[in-house]
């Protein structure tokens, strides 16, 4: 395994560990999710470029589209929770149920 792959895997694992450890605040959870998506994007791009897979070259861009949608929905939920309750705790998400 080359150094680039190992660095990207470590970035993904650190983001996953941060998501598991600091899940009380919504903003930190969203930042960890973005770190995971960014490391996945870089890993997929490097793998596709190294293996010369021309048919799979759209997959990282599709991943970025889903990451942008996830970020927009997460930030809108963060704004809604913080304006309603005044704090961004993840435990407030259970209160949003009808």
UniProtKB/Swiss-Prot annotation:
Gene Ontology terms: cellular component: mitochondrial inner membrane; respiratory chain complex I
GO biological process: ATP synthesis coupled electron transport
Localisation per UniProt entry: Mitochondrion inner membrane
Cysteine pairs bridged by disulfides in the record: none
Entries under Gene3D superfamilies matching the protein: 1.10.287.3510
Pfam families linked: Oxidored_q2
Molecular function as annotated in GO: NADH dehydrogenase (ubiquinone) activity
Keyword line: Electron transport, Membrane, Mitochondrion, Mitochondrion inner membrane, NAD, Respiratory chain, Translocase, Transmembrane, Transmembrane helix, Transport, Ubiquinone
Catalyses which reaction(s): a ubiquinone + NADH + 5 H(+)(in) = a ubiquinol + NAD(+) + 4 H(+)(out)
Domain of life of the organism encoding this protein: Eukaryota
Enzyme Commission designation: 7.1.1.2
Bilayer disposition of the protein: Multi-pass membrane protein
Transmembrane segments: 1-21, 29-49, 61-81
Assembly mode: Core subunit of respiratory chain NADH dehydrogenase (Complex I) which is composed of 45 different subunits.
Function statement: Core subunit of the mitochondrial membrane respiratory chain NADH dehydrogenase (Complex I) which catalyzes electron transfer from NADH through the respiratory chain, using ubiquinone as an electron acceptor. Part of the enzyme membrane arm which is embedded in the lipid bilayer and involved in proton translocation.
Family: Belongs to the complex I subunit 4L family.
Record-given protein name: NADH-ubiquinone oxidoreductase chain 4L
Species, as recorded: Uroderma bilobatum (Tent-making bat)
Lineage: Eukaryota, Metazoa, Chordata, Craniata, Vertebrata
Encoding gene, per UniProt annotation: MT-ND4L
